[in-house]
Amino acid sequence: MAESEAETPSTPGEFESKYFEFHGVRLPPFCRGKMEEIANFPVRPSDVWIVTYPKSGTSLLQEVVYLVSQGADPDEIGLMNIDEQLPVLEYPQPGLDIIKELTSPRLIKSHLPYRFLPSDLHNGDSKVIYMARNPKDLVVSYYQFHRSLRTMSYRGTFQEFCRRFMNDKLGYGSWFEHVQEFWEHRMDSNVLFLKYEDMHRDLVTMVEQLARFLGVSCDKAQLEALTEHCHQLVDQCCNAEALPVGRGRVGLWKDIFTVSMNEKFDLVYKQKMGKCDLTFDFYL
């Protein structure tokens, strides 16, 4: 989905009509007609997959993963179109046929729920990095994102958008189910489960986890250099002039949520996540 100024913003009703239901999950229109092909998509042992619910820090994670796996540096990444190097499986461009033919090792992204990913991934045939973000910051970022889109723009209020999020009525379905599905597979040998907030709280440990998971061997000095480069990426992402002020910071929701909204959100969160031992930092 290209981010650009909206030409014809959608009312809440029009916005909703653009999605379609697939096995009970609301998906964007560009996924229509290709879900079976996605399920049968051939994966390779050398593939590395990055999977997130939208606005979970995907752009930052892909740059960190590329840096760690390829030995790149922040300046090099800043000069390249990183999205061309890490295509999104279900997006119209470049398309499944092109992704199938990419040379190994492929780095592939997706926002699809675990159950809709290629079946070979369920069999442990490729490495999967999943990153979750606290849902309060995520819904603020998701709202800002939809306000900027050309084809899926949103004209409603943040309060209404947040209700849709709590009621599982946004693209890619329920955030609550999305993260819990992957949390249940966090011990799978081919899955690494990360949290966005840890990039800000303990980046050293995250870089160590990524290097170990990706099979990148490095001594202490190399690890320190990698971490410093990753710190640069995090700083660049959170301070980029093109982004709304502070969009990447932890605790963004506190500037947007009213007391009433926060109370309602906490109640829904407790109802839908109460049986799950996954926890989040809502501020640092």
UniProtKB/Swiss-Prot annotation:
<keyword id="KW-0753">Steroid metabolism</keyword>
<keyword id="KW-0963">Cytoplasm</keyword>
<keyword id="KW-0443">Lipid metabolism</keyword>
<comment type="similarity">
    <text>Belongs to the sulfotransferase 1 family.</text>
</comment>
<dbReference type="InterPro" id="IPR027417">
    <property type="entry name" value="P-loop_NTPase"/>
</dbReference>
<keyword id="KW-0808">Transferase</keyword>
<feature type="modified residue" description="Phosphothreonine">
    <location>
        <position position="11"/>
    </location>
</feature>
<dbReference type="GO" id="GO:0005737">
    <property type="term" value="C:cytoplasm"/>
</dbReference>
<dbReference type="GO" id="GO:0005739">
    <property type="term" value="C:mitochondrion"/>
</dbReference>
<dbReference type="GO" id="GO:0140059">
    <property type="term" value="P:dendrite arborization"/>
</dbReference>
<protein>
    <recommendedName>
        <fullName>Sulfotransferase 4A1</fullName>
        <ecNumber>2.8.2.-</ecNumber>
    </recommendedName>
</protein>
<dbReference type="GO" id="GO:0042802">
    <property type="term" value="F:identical protein binding"/>
</dbReference>
<feature type="modified residue" description="Phosphothreonine">
    <location>
        <position position="205"/>
    </location>
</feature>
<dbReference type="GO" id="GO:0005829">
    <property type="term" value="C:cytosol"/>
</dbReference>
<keyword id="KW-0597">Phosphoprotein</keyword>
<dbReference type="GO" id="GO:0008202">
    <property type="term" value="P:steroid metabolic process"/>
</dbReference>
<dbReference type="Pfam" id="PF00685">
    <property type="entry name" value="Sulfotransfer_1"/>
</dbReference>
<dbReference type="InterPro" id="IPR000863">
    <property type="entry name" value="Sulfotransferase_dom"/>
</dbReference>
<feature type="modified residue" description="Phosphothreonine">
    <location>
        <position position="8"/>
    </location>
</feature>
<comment type="function">
    <text>Atypical sulfotransferase family member with very low affinity for 3'-phospho-5'-adenylyl sulfate (PAPS) and very low catalytic activity towards L-triiodothyronine, thyroxine, estrone, p-nitrophenol, 2-naphthylamine, and 2-beta-naphthol. May have a role in the metabolism of drugs and neurotransmitters in the CNS.</text>
</comment>
<dbReference type="GO" id="GO:0008146">
    <property type="term" value="F:sulfotransferase activity"/>
</dbReference>
<dbReference type="GO" id="GO:0051923">
    <property type="term" value="P:sulfation"/>
</dbReference>
